[in-house]
């Protein structure tokens, strides 16, 4: 099992960051890899069990399902249902924690998954860098932060 953990501190208050990240169907508004997003069957994006279909900039598609959501703890989990890349049993967790020194936000994004033998490092790099770190940089731009 591969485990990827990335985190960052954003120069924005937690309420503002949560407003953006909480929208399970809104990644296309800020993540550079996502061209379009829609929930299947018109399900609300904050309904546990809803499935989002993401079309990537390269034209490929994937499906993810929201499995937990907590406004109280400002976190959620989701799993990957269909993907063109070899990620199996993928479950990810996003959690925000207030940083009271300066009204900032700590963001943890982590996942566990399996992949084909010999591809563990490549898939960990893809998830950690091309998805998570790229997402951190993109959310900063979206929130108007200076990098």
Task: Put a short name on every predicted segment.
Residues 1-41:
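Hydrophobic ligand-binding cavity/cleft-lining segments
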Residues 6-8, 62-68, 91-98, 111:
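Hydrophobic/aromatic beta-strand elements that line small-molecule binding cavities or substrate pockets
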Residues 81-134:
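Beta-strand/loop substructures that line and gate deep hydrophobic ligand-binding cavities in soluble
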Residues 28-29, 38-85, 134, 138-147:
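Glycine-rich portal/gate segments that line the openings of hydrophobic small-molecule binding cavities
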Residues 14, 59, 129-132:
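A structural signal for well-ordered alpha-helical scaffolds and beta->alpha junctions
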Residues 14-15, 68-73, 96-106:
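A short, structured loop/turn motif at beta-sheet edges
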């Amino acid at each position: 099992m591969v485990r990827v953990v990335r985190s960052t501190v954003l120069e924005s208050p937690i309420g503002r960051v949560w407003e953006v990240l909480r929208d399970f169907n809104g990644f296309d508004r800020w993540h550079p890899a996502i061209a379009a997003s829609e929930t299947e069957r018109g399900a609300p994006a904050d309904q546990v069990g809803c499935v989002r279909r993401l079309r990537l900039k390269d034209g490929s598609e994937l499906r993810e399902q929201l499995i937990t959501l907590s406004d109280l703890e400002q976190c959620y989990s989701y799993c990957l249902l269909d993907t063109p890349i070899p990620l199996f049993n993928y479950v990810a967790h996003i959690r925000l924690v207030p940083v009271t020194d300066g009204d900032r936000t700590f963001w943890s994004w982590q996942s566990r998954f399996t992949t084909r033998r010999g591809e563990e490092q490549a898939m960990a790099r893809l998830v950690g860098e091309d998805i998570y770190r790229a997402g951190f940089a993109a959310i900063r731009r979206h929130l108007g932060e200076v990098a």
